[in-house]
Amino acid sequence: MISGSVRFLVNLESLNGVESIGNLTKHRTAPVVLKTSTGYLVRYVPVISGEALAHAYQASLVDIAKKEGLPVGSLSSQYEFIKFSTDEALKIEGIKEPKDYNDARRFEVEVMLKDVIADVGGFMYAGGAPVRRTSRIKLGYMIPALRGDEIPAQLEAQFHVRFSNKPVSGSQAIFNVEVSSALYTFSFELDEDLIAVPSTFGEKVKGEEELERQKAKRVKSAIKALYSLLSGNFGGKRSRFLPSMKLMSLVVTKTDFPFMPEPAHDDDYIKTTIMRLGKAKGVLNGNLAKAYVINNEGIEVGEGVTVLSTVEDLVVKLEEE
């Protein structure tokens, strides 16, 4: 299992808009609870949804999988991650719907062989005999670091005018876009051991041997696709609101047991993660427990970690293990 917590310093972004009200395009916000010197408080803060991060990850996986010669479905090739949710989608992809629950494993394997994105990112067929595959990549909301009384985040609407050099009614318009600046954090988990492995119970079906043959390539592609998230290549409205973005720090662990690093709110999150990792290895009788750190803000990282300089170095390390 590969898991991580990440900190980005992001200035002037509009990566996750949610709606337009008149001439105002709003940024996504959500309530968070934080502990302050006076007790627990609720605050609404700018956020970037896990769906936005997952879309960027899967789009990156499409490009990487094609280069690796792995199968990508017709809809996924268009970066439309409807996958195999409806009968209409099955017709487009050339997959026969499941007859009943006993046919679910056959259906899941055929879908996985057709589209590596459905293998890694999961899918939910909602027809007469529903079949679900849980995503092997898990992503939460990207939220500001919760650091005591002050949250390092701010929203403000920026004024713009669409200019016209001719006096035509409606051609020159005012519009406002909410932008955010924040010290953002997010966490992720990639269960690479379960990639190319059917999740539906039942006897082995045709095609599983081919999945086993492709597994190494599929895992490699899934790890490479993390690069888009760790390098900040995600979100929308980038053509005119490309943010000033810097990776401040991260900790990524690779284990053979379930483990999630500390959220990147406090400055000791890496040190605490390393301390917990050693204890978790003992509690769960683990054999593999490695930690990789990038530290561009001079915080404590603890002992027994591999400190790297760049995200590129990190991805290479994860592939090698």
Curated annotation (Swiss-Prot):
InterPro entries, per database record: Cas7/Cst2/DevR_sub_I-a/Apern, CRISPR-assoc_Cas7/Cst2/DevR, CRISPR-Cas7/Cst2/DevR
Keyword DNA-binding included in the entry's annotation: no
CDD domains per the UniProt record, alphabetical: Cas7_I-A
GO molecular function terms noted in the UniProt entry: RNA binding
Alphabetically ordered keywords of this record: Antiviral defense, RNA-binding
UniProt KW RNA-binding keyword: yes
One Pfam family recorded for the sequence: DevR
Any Gene Ontology biological process: defense response to virus
Assembly and interaction partners: Part of the aCascade ribonucleoprotein complex, minimally composed of Csa2 and Cas5a, which binds crRNA. Other possible components of aCascade in strain P1 are Cas6b (SSO1437) and Csa5 (SSO1443), while SSO1399, Cas5b (SSO1400) and SSO1401 have sometimes been seen weakly associated. Csa2 is probably the major RNA-binding subunit. The Csa2-Cas5a-crRNA complex also binds target DNA homologous to crRNA, probably forming an R-loop. Purified aCascade forms a filament about 6 nm in width.
Other notes: Crystallography and cloning were done with strain P2, while interaction experiments were done with genes cloned from strain P2 but over-expressed in P1. The aCascade complex was purified from strain P1.
PANTHER family, per database record: CRISPR-ASSOCIATED PROTEIN CAS7_CST2_DEVR, PTHR37459
Family indicated by similarity: Belongs to the CRISPR-associated protein Cas7/Cst2/DevR family. Subtype I-a/Apern subfamily.
Entry function: CRISPR (clustered regularly interspaced short palindromic repeat) is an adaptive immune system that provides protection against mobile genetic elements (viruses, transposable elements and conjugative plasmids). CRISPR clusters contain spacers, sequences complementary to antecedent mobile elements, and target invading nucleic acids. CRISPR clusters are transcribed and processed into CRISPR RNA (crRNA).
Protein name: CRISPR-associated aCascade subunit Cas7/Csa2 2
